[in-house]
Amino acid sequence: MALIKFDKVFKSYDSDKIVIKDLNLSIENGEFITLIGKSGSGKTTILKMINGLLPIDSGKIFIKDKEIKDWNIIELRRDIGYVIQQIGLFPHMSIEENIGYVLDIKNEPKQNIKERAKYLINLVGMKNSYLEKYPRELSGGQRQRVGVARALAANPDIILMDEPFGAVDEITRRSLQDEIVKLHQRLNKTIVFVTHDIEEAFKLGTRIVLFEKGSIIQEGTKKEILMNPKNKFVEDFLGNKIFINYLKEMFI
């Protein structure tokens, strides 16, 4: 069953700038799908439409077989975790309070929130002692781990991730990529991950969708795209033969 479905969706920001053109895309339960493309290709817009942050001009979006316009927007967003590059942790709250924020506004018992925060901080590879700290006391990589933990707090079925590791150093970035792959394997959440980094897209995704100017150019598994690029645009986007051979050795 498609957990998320786009049916002939169009979106523009003004009359002469169409950012999503006739989008038809189904995302199955438990998939880790990476959306890749150049800046301005429409990737982040897709996440915002899934989360109800942006209305569509025409077409339909379904979440769990229910058209998005029929959802209570608060209930929808509580069932979707969102992780962004800027993280957005509340600086005046402890890490425990940040992780438990969504549960707190749902009036979950305090003890349940505390136990959930402990479970999640361990799940993302951090010790319980970090729960007492504040965001300013953490490194960039640690704050991103907390951001992932917070996104998982309400046990959502869907996790949206928008260039979440773009602001950290390369070593930390690779470590976070490894962590999110393990989390997906362990929790089987549906993850929609936006990136402009080709290697990251192939490392993480069970399916890759390549966008250009608001349209899907090619979608498929790592093997399908690497072995059978649809056209010259895809070939050029993937890079030179040396890099493509590297991707094949790493991911096929």
Region spans (language model):
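Conserved ABC ATPase "signature" region
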Residues: 104, 111-129
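Conserved ABC ATPase "signature" C-loop
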Residues: 213-214
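ABC ATPase "signature
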Residues: 219-220, 228
